[in-house]
């Protein structure tokens, strides 16, 4: 199932914190699409995923919006 998180207009570290909070509510294998506007999230969210056992399965940049798609792993 695809879940979404709107982290637009949030600055570091809020996109990562909101992503972490949302992932805690999901099960392994579920997909989360995080939409944000902070360019730092392109580095911060994938780094957080690597550390916590999740997988970035896609990134998309559209004007000012960035969408990072994550597959939730076992390591919530």
Model regions: which residues?
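Short amphipathic
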Residues: 1-8, 33-35
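A generic structural signal for beta-strand entry/edge sites
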Residues: 2, 31, 63-67
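Short cysteine clusters
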Residues: 12
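Short glycine/serine/threonine-rich phosphate/pyrophosphate-binding segments
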Residues: 15
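Amphipathic, hydrophobic secondary-structure cores in small proteins
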Residues: 18-54
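C-terminal structural segments of small proteins and small subunits
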Residues: 46-76
